[in-house]
């Protein structure tokens, strides 16, 4: 038993996994789309889902169950009597009898069904007020199975109380998911938030609203009145189709419809609401609905048995209902109510399409549910930009994006967007994780590029770390950490400066001692190496000299080359008698024997050693080695001198390292003032400017003959604006392609109405009266009769985007110049100029990806950007082309369904239709090849009936600009500028440093002039960190200046040229818990005022401001630093005591 238990456990686990797999197949999702701002009295939210087929034998036992936390209305849960009307082949037909209208028969019986969409009066109307939800289902059946469609309607307030729950129908489970979209109160259509407002079409011109096609779901409600024909709904249909003479249709009731995913109830018919009239007309044209089948049955077949009649209820003596009997894929609803009876008679007809043609008088039915589409006017909700901020979390960052109206688009190349949403009032919030902080975090949100500077996050973590290290002295821990945690070389310079100041008297002698020890060892090694080298050189010289005077140094016996004369003399004496000249041991007097002995002899260097001993020994205590050994690194004079020099050097490095690198665009830190240009010749500027960038150029133009005469010159070029004259082509639609085979045994093809004939776009081909047996199934014998009808149609139309065609294009920039007191502005087109008596500014050309006749497709809000189509069909469109299905104000434009039908036959098999044309819609093709289309960005769009203006942030769009300022200026007149500018710093927020930056609020007063174009800078005493160009008007002006830079002691002031406000304000430290991203578009500014760079005097100003800032900020930091300095001097004195005086030690 013990051995078999693991096997049993394994089998049990496998069984559980298989059970979960089976359950997963029975789980269906019902999505309820809700706006994220929900108030009182905003109607109902509705959703539906189609379930897998259920055997017809189980239908009578179906019951809709709920585990949801909302209150379900019980009116639809009760049993209701239905007449089950079915058909079958007669059993008494002889074999091989040719099929005819008499070959089939129908049967009627009474059954009880529960949970169908039989909604009593006032249930939907009071659902919102009573906080009750309605759940029901409808059936589409053939002879063997039924396709349930479950509907859920509830007060829109359930979006706040429910996130998900389960419904059950038979063995199927329905996961109800309430999904709150980014729409404030509208519905999500075409990726935009659309608010249907049906009265706009009656009261406003057509260019002020949009028209969008939206799904509508309608439910039949029975309401019987005692007198009059006001509730006889069939009368309205007959009047609409101009049918007269029908008097027997006394059913009373109305349809209650819900538009889109959420709306107020719409009553059909209603005389004073054109929406009701539109739905009524569509019901008359497509009595079974405009959605013909489920998407899984897009390619399917059905066999039509023919027209049949029957009894409803089954106790009737004559037939009261008629329809078309079929088998195969179910199409429309199989439930309805007779129009002829005053009291409702409900019919369930599996395998029969009940009569719904309102142009006949008798035996008609109305469906219990109807689904279609309706074009509605309305307005698109305005979108707002996102705010994105991040906090450091582990190795990455936790980020959050929120918008006041909703987030329709968010993506990031460096972060994982997990779509975890929160809603706070009208705001939508999305949290996500960024795994890397070694690079700046880029987030695209609501069409705007946001950049979060991660070094600011790292600074915050650094401050937290140092604050923890210095937590023993909490009074200064945070202030000291703020000074230490500065990014880049500037931060390291700060650390070295503080270390030198506090611990220099200990570190300087310690580090000097270590360096001296290393240098002494190196000097000794070098000197020793040099001694050995000199000795070898000396030996070589002696040997060469001996060879010149005495001859060869080679022994004649052993052939060994000697190095000294004594060694050669020993060889001559010993080798001839067979003795070793070194160790004097006996050996053979042959060269080979003696040389072999020399290899093992240990005294071969005896003569060289004797020579070395005879020379003078090396004295390592001379020269460099002795100087290093006797260096007095513990001298107070040396330590103090080095300490002072290091402090001065590090202060200079600290001040110089605060400058940022020069950039081609963006702000470059400069000193106060602006550049001066002597006008010895014309001033000419020629450059290329990206479409997303603005350009500011400011100089003082100096008279070369009189340096005191200067004219202020300011040039401002704004961002490029694209002006397109457009033609609104309408809304591009997506659709499901359907291919249907309808086969019946007898009669002509015109005898029956096929489902595609009520579709908006369809093609049909009939194969009539077959002459052979090869195309007839065995249960449909006969030759020369019957029909195979092939149909292709489009349904489930869905609006996917707006389409505009470019008629003409203009690229403009607003150019303003201020020369002295004269100001001129003009919106300049391409190949156009702004010309004054002294200045000429021209846009020579534009590089662009747009061309007239291009088509622009927007798949969402304009701010999301769009796609450029070079080829877009407008007249003859084929299915699958861009623009194949278009919804226009004049109606639906259907494409040509090009292709040919072929009927596939096999003996004793029902024929099947085939279509060799394209079966994929143009939209689906576009999605599959979306990357092959050019995209474009849209910022600050403005749209009207025939014009669209926007700014494209793509740097590939550029303007070639040429500026010429003539040297022939009237310096005497223009140099005298009476304009007086006074500045006051009002407020500041943000942080100093090169992180997120700060915002300085300036109050600027202009006198003596009516208007003055100039730039206001954000500076401290030494240099400036940001600027904005503004057109001042007489009086008080509030200006916001954004800057980046500075240090803890910076008091930011508002400055104009060299004049600044009298007081400055200190920004916060760059260690915010949440670092907010900035718009990349806001930083695409090129500013050039020619101001001088920060020099030596600027550095020392910055130093003084920093020191004063530290003293004013937290004087305890300075006190602690001085205490540490005194401590280090004491330790120095203790470890390095002063040497006694020489005179004191050597008194006579």
UniProtKB/Swiss-Prot annotation:
Residue ranges of the region described as Fusion loop: 767-787
Transmembrane segments: 497-517, 638-658, 1116-1136
Residue ranges annotated as Lumenal topological domain: 24-496, 659-1115
Disulphide-bridged cysteine pairs: 34-159, 68-165, 117-136, 141-146, 183-193, 218-257, 386-445, 390-399, 415-434, 462-485, 745-780, 749-787, 761-894, 775-905, 790-913, 816-825, 833-842, 873-877, 979-1009, 1002-1054, 1019-1024, 1055-1060, 1094-1098
CCHC-type zinc-finger residues: 555-575, 580-601
Signal peptide: 1-23
GO molecular function: RNA binding; zinc ion binding
Region (Binding to the ribonucleoprotein): 526-543, 598-615, 621-635, 1131-1148
GO biological process: fusion of virus membrane with host endosome membrane; signal transduction; symbiont entry into host cell; symbiont-mediated suppression of host innate immune response; symbiont-mediated suppression of host TRAF-mediated signal transduction; virion attachment to host cell
Domain ITAM, residue spans: 621-644
Keywords per UniProt: Disulfide bond, Fusion of virus membrane with host endosomal membrane, Fusion of virus membrane with host membrane, Glycoprotein, Host endoplasmic reticulum, Host Golgi apparatus, Host membrane, Host mitochondrion, Host-virus interaction, Inhibition of host innate immune response by virus, Inhibition of host RLR pathway by virus, Inhibition of host TRAFs by virus, Membrane, Metal-binding, Phosphoprotein, Repeat, Signal, Transmembrane, Transmembrane helix, Viral attachment to host cell, Viral immunoevasion, Viral penetration into host cytoplasm, Virion, Virus entry into host cell, Zinc, Zinc-finger
Substitution effect: residue 25 to R: In strain: isolate Sotkamo 2009/WHO Arbovirus collection
GO cellular component, one term: virion membrane
Residues of this chain annotated as glycosylated in UniProt: 142, 357, 409, 937
Site residues, Cleavage: 658-659
One Pfam assignment: Hanta_Gc_N
Keyword Transferase included in the entry's annotation: no
Effect of residue 988 to I: In strain: isolate Sotkamo 2009/WHO Arbovirus collection
Short motif (YxxL): ranges: 625-628
Sequence ranges on the Cytoplasmic membrane side: 518-637, 1137-1148
Family as reported in the entry's similarity comment: Belongs to the hantavirus envelope glycoprotein family.
Listed name of the protein: Envelopment polyprotein
